[in-house]
Every structure is written in structure tokens, then in C-alpha cells.
Regions:
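Amphipathic alpha-helical packing elements
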Residues: 71-105
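Short acidic DE-rich linear segments
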Residues: 110-112
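Amphipathic alpha-helical
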Residues: 52-70
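N-terminal acidic leader/helix
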Residues: 6, 10-12, 18-54
Length: 112
């Protein structure tokens, strides 16, 4: 096993943990679907939740995530984040922070 393969495995594990965190955040949006401030965000979050599940399943089967599917997940999160601006409360803050952190991390990884 080379150093590069070990680093690649660790990066994949980190990605999977990030996707899991976001999936939990998306589930919080869906669970709070009755809040008026989440009208559009619920549909976007529901699809994002499914996309996260598919990414995690892919990683379990193939030991890696499809870069194109990962990018599509990122784009979906942009839609979700854009529709959370009027949602208030502690849960809202945690969810927004989790999603924004993921978005920033993805954008930073694409600049390299």
C-alpha cells in the first residue's frame, strides 16, 4: 500500500463522514416540513437526502464516490441553502452551518 493510496482512503472516509453529517441535517429539514419558512427547502432537502444515501451506498460498494454524482449533490445543497434563509431557531442554525461548511469545503477542494 502506497502513501498516496492511504491518503486517498482517508480523504474518502472524510468525504463519507461529511456526507453523513449533511444527510442528518437534510433529515432535520424534512422532519420540520410543516414550518412555513421551509416551503421549497423541503423538496430540495428530500432529494438531497436521497442523493446522499446513493453516494454513501456507492462508496460502500465501489470504495469511492462518483465525482459527477458528488458534484450534483453539491449543486443540490446550493438550492437547499438558498431556501433556508427564513427558517429560525437552534436547529435551523445547526442545519445551515452544516450545509454551508460542506459547500465551502467542496468549493475549496475544487480550487486545487
Amino acid at each position: 500500500m502506497t502513501v498516496g493510496s492511504v491518503l486517498s482512503m482517508k480523504a474518502g472516509e472524510s468525504q463519507a463522514k461529511d456526507v453523513e453529517k449533511v444527510q442528518i441535517a437534510l433529515s432535520q429539514i424534512v422532519m420540520n416540513r410543516r414550518e412555513k419558512a421551509l416551503n421549497y427547502a423541503v423538496n430540495y432537502a428530500s432529494l438531497g437526502y436521497d442523493m446522499a444515501g446513493n453516494l454513501l451506498a456507492q462508496r460502500g460498494i465501489l470504495s469511492q464516490m462518483d465525482p459527477e454524482a458528488f458534484h450534483e449533490f453539491y449543486v443540490q445543497l446550493l438550492y437547499v441553502a438558498n431556501n433556508l434563509s427564513y427558517w429560525r431557531g437552534d436547529t435551523a442554525k445547526q442545519v445551515r452551518t452544516t450545509i454551508k461548511d460542506f459547500i465551502k469545503k467542496y468549493q475549496k477542494s475544487q480550487r486545487r
